[in-house]
């Protein structure tokens, strides 16, 4: 069985842990608990191939900036996550997460993931954003960011409703099984 290491990064509270727990247990977790590191493992079938998907959660908070890259070696694919209802987390894809991932792993495929899809059309959430003169991130904005950072895919999902959730991980696996070759040959991440 082929093993694939998938590392999930993004700002604190964008829903990385919920994404992983909802996917691996089919249940949405309760309270927000900041993550230091957690690993999940899932045996899945994608395109009739059995895969052992190793899922690595990371802490988005700045306190962990020096610790987080320790989970990067041998990564096969990164999920860079942002919340569709948190424009600052979207900007940090460009400002922080893409540069960090590319610095440590120059050729590992990236999938850009917009989380909390269920809240994009939520009236209360829209009002809260409006009070701050903000709006949710749109699908075209996400696509444009994915193109800018040369992500292999842009996907949106909800860990709460599970809409689009399985697709995120299926596409992460496909990005490793069927790589889109862009420029130099892809190598696994190695820290020197």
Curated annotation (Swiss-Prot):
Annotated localization: Cell membrane
Membrane topology: Lipid-anchor
Lipidated positions per record (S-geranylgeranyl cysteine): 189
Transmembrane annotation, as ranges: none
Record SMART domains: RAB, RAS, RHO
Prosegment residue ranges: 190-192
Chain positions found as Cysteine methyl ester: 189
Name under which the protein is recorded: Ras-related protein Rac2
